[in-house]
UniProtKB/Swiss-Prot annotation:
More about this protein: 2 of the reaction center chlorophylls (ChlD1 and ChlD2) are entirely coordinated by water.
Keyword Transport assigned: yes
Residues annotated to bind chlorophyll a PD2: 196
Protein known as: Photosystem II D2 protein
Assembly notes: PSII is composed of 1 copy each of membrane proteins PsbA, PsbB, PsbC, PsbD, PsbE, PsbF, PsbH, PsbI, PsbJ, PsbK, PsbL, PsbM, PsbT, PsbX, PsbY, PsbZ, Psb30/Ycf12, peripheral proteins PsbO, CyanoQ (PsbQ), PsbU, PsbV and a large number of cofactors. It forms dimeric complexes.
Compartments (UniProt record): Cellular thylakoid membrane
Residues given in the record as chlorophyll a ChlzD2 binding sites: 116
Chain residues that bind pheophytin a: 128, 141
Summary of the function given for this chain in its UniProt record: Photosystem II (PSII) is a light-driven water:plastoquinone oxidoreductase that uses light energy to abstract electrons from H(2)O, generating O(2) and a proton gradient subsequently used for ATP formation. It consists of a core antenna complex that captures photons, and an electron transfer chain that converts photonic excitation into a charge separation. The D1/D2 (PsbA/PsbD) reaction center heterodimer binds P680, the primary electron donor of PSII as well as several subsequent electron acceptors. D2 is needed for assembly of a stable PSII complex.
PROSITE patterns: REACTION_CENTER (PS00244)
Topology versus the membrane: Multi-pass membrane protein
Example of a GO cellular component annotation carried by this entry: plasma membrane-derived thylakoid membrane
Residues noted as binding Fe cation in the record, renumbered to the chain: 213, 267
Organism encoding this protein: Synechococcus sp. (strain CC9902)
The encoding gene: psbD1
């Protein structure tokens, strides 16, 4: 009798590393974690550092940190100075030359947070792809998360790249984002942009679908428990349905005359509406980066200029936008030393 003794297959460093990264642990790392974890850590750390200690006096002429008296709503990591253009503002670059304090004064933390934040979001999407592949499910979670990534990249990176500098991107703060929204309206008439309209329809439509779906499921739960709390009657591993699709279909058929009869189509629609809203609004922001206009009703503006008694909601909004530009620009861009004489400031037809 012959006994054959096999040799154990050789395992290279890549196989060992792959096994370690994909090991079942409390916090899954994976290959995507090599991108996600360090970039997210640095982006969050940079934001906390900036909002706590770093002033915006040298970039925007304002206070923006807790150290200067701001609160959670008014603190921000502000965009770099307009003179920095589209520099990456590396700490060791020609602007800061390795001086950390100087780097913070110039707005280097904003570039640091924006770039690391973008890579962290991409890493999180790759994490969903990786785990979906390991679990054996389809990657629609990752596809859905491409919506927030598109918005972040278009607003914080693509828009300022189309403008003269990073200065015109939104700063990382609550009130700073609100200021950016007013800026978009005043300088781009953003609310009348069709891509903004599609974005609003997608986001609010997604919220409506979410509310309707949740309420309908709660309405049609099977009475399969004896306790008053229906949540305790559900088991994650149960084979039977927990609510009645047939009853839900009958209910909405009576309400609207039509209803979803296919759960798969229903849930795809709930995925499609908000994600398309995010994608379309991102496309619109890229249009704004290129200073593209949308829905300029010039005929109404000409008639309003000729006839003091003619005014529409559109012409009123145009006047409001002119006011935003005239009053906002001197405060928003103090380095330009804008001075608008009283006679050129916008006035409504009633004046």
């Amino acid at each position: 009798m012959t006994i054959a003794v096999g040799r154990a297959p050789q395992r290279g460093w890549f196989d060992v590393l792959d096994d370690w990264l994909k090991r079942d642990r409390f916090v899954f790392i994976g290959w995507s974690g090599l991108l996600l974890l360090p970039t997210a850590y640095m982006a969050i750390g940079g934001w906390l550092t900036g909002t706590t200690f770093v002033t915006s006096w040298y970039t925007h002429g304002i206070a923006s940190s807790y150290l200067e008296g701001c609160n959670f709503l008014t603190a921000a990591v502000s965009t770099p100075a307009d003179a920095m253009g589209h520099s990456l503002l590396l700490l060791w670059g020609p602007e800061a030359q390795g001086d950390f304090v100087r780097w913070c004064q110039l707005g280097g933390l904003w570039a640091f947070v924006a770039l690391h934040g973008a890579f962290a979001l991409i890493g999180f999407m790759l994490r969903q792809f990786e785990i979906a592949r390991l679990v054996g499910i389809r990657p629609y979670n990752a596809i859905a998360f491409s919506g927030p990534i598109a918005v972040f990249v278009s607003v914080f990176l693509m828009y300022p790249l189309g403008q003269s500098s990073w200065f015109f991107a939104p700063s990382f703060g609550v009130a700073a984002i609100f200021r950016f929204l007013l800026f978009l309206q005043g300088f781009h008439n953003w609310t009348l942009n069709p891509f903004h309209m599609m974005g609003v329809a997608g986001i609010l439509g997604g919220a409506l679908l979410c509310a309707i779906h949740g309420a309908t499921v709660e309405n049609t739960l099977f009475e399969d428990g004896e306790q008053a709390n229906t949540f305790k009657a559900f088991e994650p591993t149960q084979e039977e349905e927990t609510y009645s699709m047939v009853t839900a279909n009958r209910f909405w058929s009576q309400i609207f005359g039509i209803a979803f009869s296919n759960k798969r189509w229903l849930h795809f629609f709930m995925l499609f509406v908000p994600v398309m809203g995010l994608w379309t609004s991102s496309i619109g922001i890229i249009g704004l980066a290129l200073n593209l206009r949308a829905y300029d009703f010039v005929s109404q503006e000409i008639r309003a200029a000729e006839d003091p008694e003619f005014e529409t909601f559109y012409t009123k909004n145009i006047l409001l936008n002119e006011g935003l530009r005239a009053w906002m620009a001197p405060a928003d861009q103090p380095h330009e030393n804008f001075v608008f004489p009283e006679e050129v400031l916008p006035r409504g037809n009633a004046l």
